[in-house]
Design a protein with these regions (language model features):
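Acidic catalytic loop of the alpha/beta-hydrolase fold
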Residues: 222-226, 253-254
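Alpha/beta-hydrolase fold nucleophile elbow
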Residues: 149-159
Length: 281
């Protein structure tokens, strides 16, 4: 009997070690698969318009803040717009590569901000799920604490993999609204609905239910990277008020172009000012 107990304890230790090893290996592998900062090369530097380092304790977190006048040099005081929007960029791009869709809003009096995830652009570190959350939270805190925005005047917009940190921020911090463009249910579920790993990075399907602000979701009807059905399912899980905008597009990266750039900016600006109107639900 004692021998059996000893054997069971040994087997239990082996199982625990295998699980721990699988977690470590799985995390490392999925980080390598998920993040591709090597393709994010928009060539900005510290002298680029609106660049600011919002890092603490000697760790650089590269951010860009434009507005309300586009192209304000960083040497001038960053003017406070009537509302701010945080753009959480996609995978194979950095923060400067994602601003093209929104930066004209700065001319209308809004503050447009973005941050690079760890390992992207000029941000220090290596990309991880938690690192993405941390940098986006830091930009939010910086806008509220340093620039004086009210939390309800900060909108967060996440594109593609950026839907993960955007949804996490909206689920854990008070914000004025959440915009998701071509979002996924979770990162691994883009490839398979079956959970193959002990981790499920960027679990939007679990977090969206905790979002209490207005939600706007856009998705290409024939998206060639993230299935349209995932954006639709995420919309069904979201709380009211919410709005779903299908876009006749098969290009994952060009939603604003296929929707119409001027229409897109009007849609975003209207959401920032008015949330979801009754007739838009």
């Amino acid at each position: 009997m004692a021998m059996i107990k000893k054997l069971l304890k040994s087997l239990l230790r082996i199982v625990i070690l295998v699980i721990m090893l699988g977690f470590v290996v799985g995390t490392s592998c999925i980080n390598t698969i998920m993040f591709h900062p090597e393709f994010a090369r928009d060539g900005y530097d510290e002298k680029s318009p609106g660049y600011v380092d919002i890092g603490t304790n000697g760790v650089r977190i590269a951010a860009v803040v434009r507005g309300p006048e586009r192209g304000d040099p960083p040497s001038q005081e960053l003017r406070r717009g009537k509302k701010a929007i945080i753009r959480c960029h996609g995978n194979a791009e950095d923060m400067m590569g994602t601003l093209w869709a929104l930066e004209d809003l700065a001319e209308e009096g809004y503050t447009v901000a973005a941050v690079d995830y760890p390992g992207y652009g000029l941000s220090d570190g290596s990309p991880t799920e938690e690192g993405c959350y941390r940098n986006v939270h830091r930009l939010y805190d910086w806008l509220v604490e340093t620039r004086g925005f009210k939390p309800e005047d900060v909108i967060v917009d996440g594109f593609s993999i950026g839907s993960g940190p955007a949804t996490e921020l909206a689920a854990t911090k008070p914000v004025g609204g959440l915009i998701l463009e071509a979002p996924f249910l979770s990162a691994p579920r883009v490839v398979t609905r079956i959970r193959l790993l002990p981790i499920d990075p960027f679990p939007n399907l679990e977090r969206i239910v905790d979002v209490k602000c207005p939600v706007l979701i856009m998705h290409g009807t024939k998206d060639n990277v993230i299935p349209f059905s995932q954006g639709k399912e995420l919309f069904e899980l979201a709380n009211e008020p919410k709005r779903f905008v299908p876009v006749m597009s098969n290009d994952h990266n060009l939603l604003p172009n296929h929707y119409g750039e001027s229409r897109y900016r009007e849609l975003i600006a209207d959401f920032m000012e008015n949330g979801i109107k009754e007739e838009q639900k």
